[in-house]
Amino acid sequence: MDCRKMARFSYSVIWIMAISKVFELGLVAGLGHQEFARPSRGYLAFRDDSIWPQEEPAIRPRSSQRVPPMGIQHSKELNRTCCLNGGTCMLGSFCACPPSFYGRNCEHDVRKENCGSVPHDTWLPKKCSLCKCWHGQLRCFPQAFLPGCDGLVMDEHLVASRTPELPPSARTTTFMLVGICLSIQSYY
């Protein structure tokens, strides 16, 4: 690839990322649903849960509206009961958790995160789909992935464990992004 093609390609990637971010912000601001306002659990799976608060706001306040952080010298004045499940509060905002708990406030119990006999963070085939046990819930893909399955998954027993369907606006955004990617790919 010569320099011009490489430059066009990098501009295209930046353009796609900018468009997808605009659509993502539009979805978050327009839907008003908590599950779309926060990052998905799959996104959090690659990050430490102690970094992200459990109720992250969709739109962050301006820096002028934030409360200034307290210094370490004021830590004796902070609330010492910030941790759950017997965790020890450190500097008013961090927790040292007992062995079977984790999270910013020791709110996650490893012992309760299994899905019956299926351990947490384990993939398993279920009918014609793939499912994953995540924080005590079995989440299944609605598409057929396994060999020998021709159509959509017939999962009358898994309705409660499926992830929610995307609203029409999110589906439109997805198809629009795919179209943009395909048109850029055909350009090269």
From Swiss-Prot:
Tissue expression notes: Preferentially expressed in gastric and colorectal carcinomas than in their normal counterparts. Expressed in breast and lung.
Keyword Nucleotide-binding: no
A GO CC term assigned to this protein in UniProt: apical plasma membrane
Propeptide, residue positions: 151-188
One Pfam family hit: CFC
Gene3D superfamilies: Laminin (2.10.25.10)
Lipidation (GPI-anchor amidated aspartate): D150
Protein name listed in UniProt: Protein Cripto
Native source species: Homo sapiens
